């Protein structure tokens, strides 16, 4: 079976702003299947932003489950993330899903992994997907050495990742929340 792979999702938190951005490329082995996929979206009445890396169908399943958890817990990001992770670990059908979610609201940011882990990032920075290490390095350098806004850092770091990672392109979707 052919596997869809590759993407880059980056989240940066700076001052009263949190931004998640992602590229638009969907690849199957060495073929670009789509260049303008939307892997970042707003959830729960525009109070939460989220991005995914991994299998597209798997990620949409997780988005739906995560949004249901947000509704159930009235937008409490931490509780929704932990409850989704519990389900992910205990539900056999979910355990087979291959995706990572990066989620954020005004207060917190998390990576929710396929192992059922909920990870709060260091430095207010999340980078997942095939181009994640490149985007993370670029974003960290920009965070430490410039006064750029979180949005500018996300855009520049994703552009750098796209120059390096063959599974990442420059068709970006960027969402932000400001406090």
Curated annotation (Swiss-Prot):
PROSITE patterns: PROTEASOME_BETA_2. The active site is at residue 7. Signal peptide: none annotated. This is ATP-dependent protease subunit HslV. It comes from Nitrosococcus oceani (strain ATCC 19707 / BCRC 17464 / JCM 30415 / NCIMB 11848 / C-107). GO terms for cellular component: HslUV protease complex; proteasome core complex. Pfam families: Proteasome. It is an enzyme of class 3 (hydrolase). Keywords: Allosteric enzyme, Cytoplasm, Hydrolase, Metal-binding, Protease, Sodium, Threonine protease. Na(+) binds at residues 162, 165, 168.
């Amino acid at each position: 079976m052919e596997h869809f792979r590759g993407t880059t999702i980056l989240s940066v938190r700076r001052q009263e702003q949190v931004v998640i951005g992602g590229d638009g490329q969907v690849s199957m082995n060495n073929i670009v299947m789509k260049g303008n996929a939307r892997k970042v979206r707003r959830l729960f009445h525009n109070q939460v932003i989220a991005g995914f890396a991994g299998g597209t169908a798997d990620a949409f399943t997780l988005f739906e489950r995560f949004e249901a958890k947000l509704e159930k817990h009235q937008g409490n990001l931490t509780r929704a993330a932990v409850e989704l992770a519990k389900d992910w670990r205990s539900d056999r059908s979910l355990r087979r899903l291959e995706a990572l979610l990066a989620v954020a609201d005004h207060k917190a940011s998390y990576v929710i992994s396929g192992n059922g882990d909920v990870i709060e990032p260091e430095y207010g920075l999340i980078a997942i997907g095939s181009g994640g290490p490149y985007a993370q390095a670029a974003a960290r350098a920009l965070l430490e050495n410039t006064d750029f806004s979180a949005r500018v850092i996300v855009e520049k770091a994703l552009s750098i990742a796209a120059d390096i990672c063959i599974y990442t392109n420059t068709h970006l979707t960027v969402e932000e929340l400001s406090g």
